[in-house]
């Protein structure tokens, strides 16, 4: 449901933020 969507969005945002801040090797 909507909570599942929010969870996925949050995880995606965290992954993107980590990539931008930490320069993670994975694209």
UniProtKB/Swiss-Prot annotation:
Domain of life: Eukaryota
Principal location: secreted
UniProt note on tissues of expression: Expressed by the skin glands.
Subcellular location: Secreted
GO terms under cellular component: extracellular region
Official protein name in the record: Caerulein precursor fragment R8
Stated family: Belongs to the gastrin/cholecystokinin family.
Annotated function: Antimicrobial peptide.
Keywords, alphabetical: Amphibian defense peptide, Antimicrobial, Secreted
BP-aspect Gene Ontology terms: defense response
Organism: Xenopus ruwenzoriensis (Uganda clawed frog)
């Amino acid at each position: 449901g909507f909570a599942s969507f929010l969870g996925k969005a949050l995880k995606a945002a965290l992954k993107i933020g980590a990539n931008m801040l930490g320069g993670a090797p994975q694209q």
